[in-house]
């Protein structure tokens, strides 16, 4: 993978879904060769697994009923199973859920959004906790990410880790439109990009395909393919509880 930011990865991600709301074979093949092949395949498998849950915290007030329209990690399997009664209520909830999810998709790509988001990936290994992913800080709690990070620490002990893993762009004339692996995105005087070829796991790549591309891509996996769940959280207590549960 080339770290040159003339390669605008987020534009490629945005073309992964074509105008027919289908995966574009040409772009999929291109990305397959652009990234390490096994890594890209694992990221695509995650997107189709049904194990990815995007939690969204909105600073404004949201009614408790809107929170209940989407399942949590714990009850997702049950909530996908149709009930023997109350079909009309389920249809109404599904319609409301779609509207709510559409709204979240648009807000997540609004440049002025105040929404905070985290990805939780359900694991299938016994006694393994869910995996926590944060794009804004380029962090993943998985063992693979931690092993890459530790490797960089060991290789460059005399150099500050930020000098090894962060690429700074100070010249405004060289600013990139790419959103992939960008941190501190709201700075007006500097751009910072993580050297993703040194520090990336399939969870970060999959999450980037969702949130560093386009609303079309995010909408495909959350509303069309329905393999990624959007879960809105309306208050800070629930948000903190989510993080505490992941740590514990």
Curated annotation (Swiss-Prot):
The keyword DNA-binding does not apply. Disulfide bonds: none annotated. Keywords: DNA damage, DNA recombination, DNA repair, Nucleus. GO terms for biological process: DNA recombinase assembly; maintenance of rDNA. Residues 73-99 are annotated as: Disordered. Plays a role in a RAD51/RAD54-dependent homologous recombination repair (HRR) pathway to repair MMS-induced lesions during S-phase. Required for error-free repair of spontaneous and induced DNA lesions to protect the genome from mutation. This is Suppressor of hydroxyurea sensitivity protein 2. It comes from Vanderwaltozyma polyspora (strain ATCC 22028 / DSM 70294 / BCRC 21397 / CBS 2163 / NBRC 10782 / NRRL Y-8283 / UCD 57-17) (Kluyveromyces polysporus).
């Amino acid at each position: 993978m080339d770290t040159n930011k003339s390669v605008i990865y987020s534009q490629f991600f945005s073309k992964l879904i074509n105008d027919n709301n289908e995966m574009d074979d040409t772009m999929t093949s291109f990305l397959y060769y652009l990234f390490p092949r096994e890594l890209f395949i694992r990221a695509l498998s995650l997107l189709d697994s049904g194990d990815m849950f995007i939690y969204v915290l909105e600073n404004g007030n949201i009614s408790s009923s809107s929170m209940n329209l989407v399942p949590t990690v714990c009850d997702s399997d049950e909530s996908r199973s149709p009930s023997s009664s109350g079909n009309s209520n389920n249809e109404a909830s599904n319609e409301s859920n779609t509207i709510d999810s559409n709204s979240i998709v648009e807000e997540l790509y609004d440049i002025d959004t105040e929404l905070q988001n985290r990805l939780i990936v359900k694991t299938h290994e016994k006694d393994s906790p869910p995996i926590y992913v944060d794009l804004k800080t380029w962090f993943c709690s998985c063992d693979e990410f931690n092993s890459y990070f530790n490797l960089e620490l060991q290789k460059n002990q005399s150099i500050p880790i930020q000098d090894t893993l962060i690429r700074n762009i100070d010249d405004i004339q060289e600013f990139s439109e790419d959103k992939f692996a960008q941190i501190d995105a709201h700075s007006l005087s500097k751009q910072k990009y993580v050297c993703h070829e040194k520090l990336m796991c399939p969870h970060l790549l999959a999450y980037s395909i969702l949130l560093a591309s386009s609303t079309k891509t995010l909408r495909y996996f959350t509303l069309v393919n329905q393999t990624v769940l959007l879960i809105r959280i309306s208050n800070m207590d629930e948000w903190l509880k989510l993080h505490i549960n992941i740590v514990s």
